[in-house]
Amino acid sequence: VDYNSLFMKKEHEDPLATLQQRYPIRYHNPSRVPVQLLIAGNKLRIRFFVRYGKNMLENFPGTDVTYADIAESGIRKNWGGLYYFPWLADDGFERAHAKANVRILDNNEDPSEEEISPLQPSVRVTVEFVRFGSSTAASGFPKQQFYRVKLTGGSFFPAHVISPPWRWYWGFFRTLQLESLHLNWCRNHPGIITLQKEQDRYTFQQIAAHETGHLLGLGDAYGASYRFFYEAPGTGSFMMCHNRKVQSAELEMVFHSHMTNHMQYFPRKFHYETFISGLRREYQLQFHALAKNDRNRH
């Protein structure tokens, strides 16, 4: 089962529309929204208002680049780019681009419609970061709310996104999802990111991009304990499964999150053998982590 293909097939017969027409996302009070989707036609800018912990501004081992810079680079690389949807209409960009190509290549100042061949329309995504304390933040967004990113050197707890304690537990009754016990997501309170120190730069970037998916309003797709160790079918190549690549289906789930102000979750189910196998594997991993920490202390 290919989750991405099923997602696309479901919407293949929908009427064509630009991104702005299909998802007219607006924020009543933008200064209270730390992560914003800014849409014009088929152009999407994801703007992050971020406040880094002190150690995120330290240099990554073996480089003269900070953890924060490397994380931002990974998020831009993974979430930026072109995304294709079966319902997407051209906002004029592809037609204008095709017309300009004919003008230059064929020396034709006024090509006809038959002479131009626009490419398939795509959502064009760019990523922007506004850091707390920067001149941009001070001058352009003086009352803006920021989300926090922390860095830990411990290995017992993996990287995660969590809500402040006052938002714990009651979110379950909004979603009936175990994931929402400690991440009670909404646009005004997307969560606090905690990243782990990593030796490998690429791994750190991919983890940062995955955790950013939670910040944007996506649940996990991999076989986590709160998913009964059940991996959503057909999501092996997804960012929210194995930190691989952001798929169009994932981005569309983000649109739904910000339209509805509710986190979007991948399908899960309880399967006894899968659950027992996952529980055994989780115990072994925790045991090895504890043993490693004990050796490091001695």
PLM regions: where:
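N-terminal low-structure segments adjacent to metalloprotease catalytic domains
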Residues: 1-100, 296-298
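Extended hydrophobic/Leu-rich segments
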Residues: 3-7, 16-19, 23, 116-119, ...
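Acidic/proline-rich low-complexity IDRs
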Residues: 5-7, 15-18, 37, 104, ...
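Extracellular/periplasmic catalytic domains that process cell-envelope and extracellular macromolecules
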Residues: 38-40, 139-143, 230-234
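Residues in well-ordered beta-strands of folded domains
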Residues: 47-49, 148-150, 240-241, 264
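Short, surface-exposed beta-strand/loop "edge" segments at domain boundaries and coil↔beta transitions
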Residues: 52-62, 151-170, 245-251, 270
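Metzincin-family zinc-dependent endopeptidase catalytic domain
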Residues: 65-227
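The catalytic-center signature of Zn2+-dependent metalloproteases
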Residues: 194-298
